[in-house]
Amino acid sequence: MSEPAHDVAEQQIDPWEAAYLRFETQEEEIRKFTDRLRRLGAGEWPRESNVVELFCGRGNGLHALARLGFRNIEGVDLSPRLLAEFSGEALCYVGDCRELPFADQTKDAAIVQGGLHHLPVLPDDLERVFAELRRVLRPQGRVLFVEPWLTPFLRALHGVAQHPPLRRWSMKLDALATMIEHERQTYENWLDRPQEIAQLARRYFRAEHESFAWGKWNFVGRPRL
């Protein structure tokens, strides 16, 4: 079941969420998301599009979409604590992205920025999310995914994050290392399955853009009918 985030009581923050909140400021993350969405083509989408962001967290991706001029925006995330951080106009739901609270073919675009790698059971959960996305998207809709990928850059970053002196020197690096520690099982399970993940995405969506750089997988596509 899903419910509007503002109806959910505050919950005690967990260690992963605490690290996420100190990894970068709200403004830093909004600027990052705005630049990323523009770079991946979202700046060219019609502004009246119905756009939903899955795993939207504290809603900075929703703020980025609003800055780009989108007016019909919704978000879904499992964490009421993170959603309580959002102060924008988009309607946000506490809900499971494997079972979306939307009718068939009602969305023009769906965005995931760093949420798929949190899924506990791969590939089953990933296929459930992809099937739900294909269900709620209109035939000419789009998906946009940005997820961690084990490029040489990310391997090097993992190595640096293992050194306590460097973590003490950089709050951002320490926050990243803490997030990895608290999601290690799902994170490493995701990174260990690159071919399987990419093939599953291409089975559900026809790629218009796909790239692997700076520790990220960037995918933009349309649903296969």
What residues fall within each predicted segment?
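Class I SAM-dependent methyltransferase SAM/SAH-binding core
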Residues: R58-E99
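Conserved class I S-adenosyl-L-methionine
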Residues: M1-P46, E48-G57
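C-terminal alpha-helical "lid/dimerization" subdomain adjacent to the S-adenosyl-L-methionine
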Residues: V146-R202, E210-S211
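Short catalytic micro-motifs in class I SAM-dependent methyltransferases
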Residues: G114-H118
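A conserved beta-strand element that flanks and buttresses the S-adenosyl-L-methionine
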Residues: I111
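Core SAM-dependent methyltransferase catalytic element
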Residues: R203-L225
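A short glycine-rich, Lys/Arg-flanked "PGG" loop and its adjoining helix->strand segment in the class I
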Residues: E127-P139
